[in-house]
Regions:
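Preference for protein termini
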Residues: 1-490
Length: 490
């Protein structure tokens, strides 16, 4: 009996009538069509519950998101408006053993990337030893010469990271992308959990799930650890671009969770290289800034002169050691998509260890032979712009038109440094409740890593879902959604 027949006999009853297995790893089912142990209760519950009840719960979740203002902004759309962040009712369930590997691998990776940043802005041993090409680092638009020789608190450049993982068909998690500048989405992870507890308490109480509610306090402790020398009780502020930013909900959410001030650039001023915040009681010194603004915009005197989002003189205050920034300026070189290809070598160089989490095979288009191969196989590969995020600047070969491939061919030939290519991967699919049916959709996972006095990884992360059938793009700006991620206790 083939796996499809077995699957049909045992599990293909409504609401699974449209559920089909393929070569991708399925989070709920084995290749033979059996529910995996961690999904057995959820599978049974879905067989028992009427579709009307599931629809009611999904509607209740949507209303909760709307009432709480849990939205994001899509730029450039026809409406250009705020939308509810699409939420799928069915949780993603990860075993404790799987999580233990993820946690170790992410800890190893964030430590190595911080050592790399410290090195390239000081002695540059890794460049002189030709492990990473100098040209790659110095040509990166996120490499900041202003950071050369500057010490940062505890030598930690990246205090807050979101690292994107996918699960391949063999069941292994691999790293797809490092987000080390201004990672976003953690508020949706926290909101998803609260909504799930509210709309599906029976399911939630049946599983032994590790909590994530302490993220806000863990983030606050991380920011406090960055206080300048001799500052025992730092004043911390979250610097937001303002209400029109797509992640503004997250900025307000996190500031509230931590009990810190939410400020815009116009609320801050610099005097004698010290940062002050305007308050109703007068000026108050600020010691640590959690910035949700990219390097280019933080200081119009140092970077983009047209920026109205930052604070004039902030870089000088930072260089004088009077204020700490999370993340440090210049971390973007470490999440450049071309530099990504060297992270396994970076881990081996600094830690003398093999990577616990593997990379995806990556073609560097500055290499002539690799470039020629990619140009001949554009219809099979994924091409990414090295400095873009959010699913922009990307060509998914199998889903592209001849015209799109020609556009990318021209761009690559003009600026090969600005692009990388990777195989089109069949990453895992998880069950989603869509239009009264349970169907599989591709998912990734973004765990959030904090690096203060130690590395802290809240057990879970944001599982993003490509809600369009067949789509591999999980970004909310491109029609993706999210679901609650459960890490089980042993």
């Amino acid at each position: 009996v083939d796996s499809t027949e077995t699957f049909t006999q045992r599990a293909f009853l409504p609401p699974f009538a449209n559920y089909q297995l393929d070569i991708a790893y399925d989070e709920m089912f084995t290749p033979e069509g059996q529910p995996r142990p961690n999904y057995q209760y959820l599978h049974q519950l879905l067989l028992e519950l009427p579709a009307t009840e599931l629809r009611q719960r999904q509607h209740a979740a949507d209303i909760t998101f709307l009432n709480q203002g849990i939205t994001f902004t899509v730029y450039g759309g026809s409406d250009g408006t705020e939308r509810i962040f699409p939420y799928d009712l069915l949780p993603r369930i990860i075993t404790s053993d799987e999580w233990a590997t993820i946690e170790k691998g992410l800890t190893q990776r964030i430590i190595a990337l911080n050592l790399f940043l410290k090195d390239i802005y000081h002695e540059a041993h890794i460049l002189n030893d030709k492990i990473v090409p100098k040209a790659l680092v110095y040509s990166c638009r996120y490499f900041r010469r202003e950071m050369m020789g500057l010490r940062v608190p505890n030598d930690i450049y990246v205090s807050i990271a979101g690292i994107d993982l996918i699960r391949l068909s063999d069941g292994q998690f691999v790293v797809l992308e490092d987000n080390l500048r201004v990672p976003s989405g953690v508020s949706y992870m926290l909101a998803n959990r609260q909504v799930m507890k509210h709309v599906f308490p029976r399911l939630f109480s049946r599983y032994d799930i590790r909590p994530i509610d302490h993220y806000g306090q863990a983030l606050l402790a991380t920011l406090r650890s960055l206080a300048p020398p001799n500052c025992t009780d730092p004043t911390i502020a979250l610097l937001t671009p303002g209400v029109f930013n797509s992640a503004y909900f997250e900025h307000t959410f996190l500031a509230r969770q931590m009990g810190i001030e939410l400020v815009e650039g116009r609320d801050l001023l610099i005097h004698n290289n010290i940062v002050y915040m305007r308050t109703t009681g007068g000026l108050k010194r600020v010691d640590v800034i959690y910035r949700r603004i990219d390097d280019d915009f933080v200081d119009p005197l140092a970077f983009r002169p047209d920026s109205t989002l930052g604070v004039a003189g902030l870089l000088n205050a930072y260089r004088c050691g009077n204020v700490s920034l999370a993340n440090a300026i210049g971390t973007g070189i470490a999440d450049d998509k071309a530099l990504y290809a060297y992270v396994p070598a970076i881990i081996r160089y600094y830690l003398k260890e093999d990577p616990i989490l593997q990379n995806v095979e990556t073609y560097l288009l500055t290499d002539k032979s690799q470039r020629n191969y990619v140009l001949e196989h554009l219809g099979e590969l994924v091409v990414k712009a090295v400095g873009e995020s959010g699913g922009y600047g990307m060509l998914i070969g199998p889903h592209s038109t001849q015209e799109q491939r020609e556009q990318f061919r021209k761009r690559i030939l003009v600026e090969p440094r600005n692009y990388i290519a990777q195989p089109t991967l069949s990453f895992s699919r998880a069950p989603c409740f869509l239009d009264g049916q349970v169907e599989p959709r591709h998912v990734d996972l973004r765990p959030y890593i904090l690096y203060g006095k130690q590395v802290t990884i809240v057990p879970g992360g944001l599982t993003r879902v490509a809600l369009r059938r067949g789509s591999l793009v999980v970004n909310s700006s491109q029609g993706g959604g999210s679901k609650d991620t459960w890490i089980l206790y042993d």
